[in-house]
Amino acid sequence: MSPERRPVEIRPATAADMAAVCDIVNHYIETSTVNFRTEPQTPQEWIDDLERLQDRYPWLVAEVEGVVAGIAYAGPWKARNAYDWTVESTVYVSHRHQRLGLGSTLYTHLLKSMEAQGFKSVVAVIGLPNDPSVRLHEALGYTARGTLRAAGYKHGGWHDVGFWQRDFELPAPPRPVRPVTQI
């Protein structure tokens, strides 16, 4: 039996959301290997990242009945200028709100935003094994590109990292990426 579908609001993330986001992600940091951090984050770390990145990269949250239940966001892939049209995407859904379709809903909105902004390529880095994340990314058009074996050590074992990529059609040479506020 699947969980009951409830109304979901997808909206830009704000600093006020970051405590809830921090709780969501810290659950995975503490209990799994889907995130390779080993120490919990603070809400202020999330606020700092949001404020540093939100003009160029979309950061979205999903609310279910007024509660922040997930986040999808993008950030730079690499610091070199030639990578300006490539981003890294990330999504987390609260363990309390699984199987409601929030991951795909958040990601669909995030991908539309990134395409409208003029990004060319989106990379997802997935700690393996993580079959639900692999299925989600592949259902959204990402293609497996490679695996780094034993890339991280956490919870008593070595874990691989997989790279998935999705491309958008853009002209060459590309135009400058538009800020989030201009889409």
UniProtKB/Swiss-Prot annotation:
PROSITE patterns: GNAT (PS51186). Its EC number is 2.3.1.183. It catalyses: phosphinothricin + acetyl-CoA = N-acetylphosphinothricin + CoA + H(+). Acetyl-CoA binds at residues 91-93, 99-104, 130. Introduced by genetic manipulation and expressed in glufosinate-tolerant canola and maize by Agrevo. SUPFAM superfamilies: Acyl-CoA N-acyltransferases (Nat) (SSF55729). GO terms for biological process: response to antibiotic; response to herbicide. Keywords: Acyltransferase, Antibiotic resistance, Genetically modified food, Herbicide resistance, Transferase. Pfam families: Acetyltransf_1 (PF00583). It is an enzyme of class 2 (transferase). Residues 8-169 form the N-acetyltransferase domain. GO terms for molecular function: phosphinothricin N-acetyltransferase activity. Inactivates phosphinothricin (PPT) by transfer of an acetyl group from acetyl CoA. This enzyme is an effector of phosphinothricin tripeptide (PTT or bialaphos) resistance. Belongs to the acetyltransferase family. PAT/BAR subfamily. This is Phosphinothricin N-acetyltransferase. It comes from Streptomyces viridochromogenes (strain DSM 40736 / JCM 4977 / BCRC 1201 / Tue 494). The gene is pat.
